[in-house]
Amino acid sequence: MTREEATNNALSKVLLVKSTILNLGTGMGKTLIAIKCINKIADFNFKQNEEETTVSIIVPRQALIENWKAEIKKWGCNTDKIEILCYDSIHKVNNYSDILVFDEGHHLSELKREYLDSILKVNPNVKLLFLSATIPRDIMDYMKSLGTYNIVKGNIADGIKDEVLPTPIIYTIPLYLDNIKSVAEIIKNPRCSNPVTCNYDERWNFIKRFTTRKIIIKCTQKQYYNELSDKIDWYKRKFMFNKTVVFKNKWLRAASERLKWLSEQKVDICQSIISLLQDQRVLLFCNNIEQSLKFKDYAPINSKNKNSLQNLDDFNNSKINHISSVNMLSEGMNLTNCRVCLFCNLNASEILSQQKFGRSLRHPKPIVIIPYFKDTRDEELKDKMLKDYDSSMIKEITNIKDIKL
């Protein structure tokens, strides 16, 4: 589906349905389509009753408020009665707005849906616009349940196929966990003192013998990964058996720990890759703030860095060419002329993976680089992330010097 087709689809039905759901990938022009829908509704309302249309736009973060203001100024809006606020302030929304716009609509948690339900009770004729590249099934079902709807759908892969978005070169780099050198440690009885040390093959004997002493088990990368995976599987089975929230939390925490550990093992290869990218404009995705600080030449963008927005502005104005991100820049934040996206971290969330992938598609010749560990959760997430993309875009390489810039 082209941008023009998506726009025509939305505009042709926006006056006829309760909800217009713009389920479109990054770069497909969701914001502009939404503004055009607002204008069409506003024109219709003015012809009907000569009153200006009121609009409430709800966004995930404060920074996106400025994005919307800039887009409205750029494209023009047929009403001045517009309020823009964050999801956390949804309780402050004008209950009698003519149009409610939910940017990044996948943020509609159960609590936020309750607020929307309360608005619909007092304002049943309000028009709804939902914008999101990736909408979970439960939220999509909720959107459909609100009345008549029109879904305008197209993912990033569709946008590339239809030449709406540029075709990226995707380099995947298989890595292997070492199973020879003992470079990691597994700690048992961490709160105990008087530690003893053993190798991986001796672990069960030591665990049985030293129940009141701290045990340090020397192991390889592969053995450490297997230990993490066994722990995840055990917590998962316990949760599936008795549905106890405690085990669910431990299962999810262990799964997060595994992804963090895999990401840490890729720091060296990513350091080598970025040494080849000195002349490129690069976005590096990291797992955590501590990891991002290891890449000293990359300006960090994260929730703890008060200079994050300045770093983003400097990047977009070409004052700097290299930035790293931790749990930011995945949605709604535009990057100017960013050619390379390097993934030091892969996400279990399909929503986050696709949002991050879309950051690179603002450049006419984008490059995506994904190092991953074979036969691990990393490989599963890489395959899941790329499942919709044509194989001709994907180049598996074993030598980073094969990256063509």
Predicted regions and their residues:
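Conserved pre-motif I regulatory segment
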Residues: 1-23
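Walker A/P-loop
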Residues: 17-37
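Interdomain linker/hinge connecting the two RecA-like lobes of the SF2 helicase core
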Residues: 18-21, 157-281, 286-287
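Conserved helix-turn-beta segment of the N-terminal RecA-like "Helicase ATP-binding" lobe
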Residues: 53-55, 62-82, 98
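Conserved helicase ATPase core of P-loop NTP-dependent helicases/translocases
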Residues: 66, 70, 281-285, 290-333, ...
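A short beta-strand element within the Helicase C-terminal
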Residues: 98-101, 322-326, 330-347, 352-354, ...
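Post-DEXD/H (motif II) to motif III coupling segment of the RecA-like Helicase ATP-binding lobe
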Residues: 110-170
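Conserved segment of the helicase C-terminal RecA-like domain
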Residues: 359-391
